[in-house]
Amino acid sequence: MVTRGAGQNSTYYGTIADIVLSQKYATPIGRIVTPHYPREATGPDLNQIMMGSEGTFGVLTEVTLKVFRWQPENRKRFSYMFRDWETAMAAAREMMQCECGYSSVFRLSDPEETHLMLKLYNVDETPLAPLMDKLGYKDMERCMFLGFTDGEKGFSKNVAKNIHRIARRYGAMPMTGYVTKSWEKGRFNDPYLRDTLMDFSVITDTLECSVNWSNMAQVHRDVRAVCHALPNTIVTTHMSHCYPQGANLYFIFITRMNDAAEFKRYHTTILDAIQKSGAAISHHHGIGKMFAPWLEGYIGEKEYGVLKDYFDPDYTMNPGGTIGLDLKPEEKKCLNERKDYR
């Protein structure tokens, strides 16, 4: 909520910013309460101002959310294999701009992530593996696209139908529902591998950013180049949380680290690359303390400071650099280096 998060199904249902009706906060200047109406045109939106404050303006005590009908019987799963990343991105853009509705989960993996997914879900051991090779969907070039649709029966079916139509037009090979079901099965278990890997000094972490379609290829290329600058590093990327205007790019790296200082240096180079490439430094993970040094360079110097002075004049709420509000000048990164891509 206070990090402006987004769930895996946000392409259809929206992010937290789309489904909040009202909030209540306890702040140093008193209670802040917003009314819950479906929409208002009454000046600046206090709901949006408070969301993303990460505890620096006050403590969230209550929230009213929109709800949706849950109709799992209407879900339509899909998965396709594209020959390369560029073609897959073009198809994804067309799917999001064709005015045919959006799927609930919309996930496109780049070649490196596709390679790992096929092994992790044992697709390499099925008849699909030799068939892909025979048809020209080459390893470390091909890209996996998967997801599912939700909603009313006719709507869900029509969205899946149009995704199929566009995917085939861009030369994608239909895969079975096995791939999507395998992803769903391990969706919330795979991240726990992180703790086991750390016992062997192997670190895995994720960084994500919001990108316009016009800049998607460059951000993907530039950030991955920085990630791969560290020897023996696995870097996977997928596109998810998509919109007609762009999407979220999600970078995952796996590498061996000697200590926390090395991790911080590496992490910093990646965030520098994201900021300099013209992407938003966070789509849904928020800012916190780790991303805080880059925030002023992204939104400007005065905006958050003015709000902080009003809601928390003594700076008692969540101190220590959260969203960059009390950082020293020498701690700030990438000032005056933001690029805008329209």
At which residue positions do the language-model features occur?
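A short, flexible low-complexity segment enriched in Lys/Arg and Gly/Pro that occurs
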Residues: 21-40, 86, 221, 255-265, ...
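Short beta-alpha connecting loops at secondary-structure transitions
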Residues: 76-78, 204, 289-295
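Small/polar glycine-rich anion-binding or flexible loop at a beta-alpha turn
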Residues: 110-112, 242-245, 281, 286-293, ...
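C-terminal substrate-recognition/cap domain of FAD-linked oxidoreductases
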Residues: 89-269, 273, 277
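Activity-critical C-terminal alpha-helical subdomain
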Residues: 288-342
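FAD-binding subdomain of flavoenzyme oxidoreductases
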Residues: 1-107, 334-342
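Short, hydrophobic/aliphatic alpha-helical segments
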Residues: 32-50, 264-278, 305
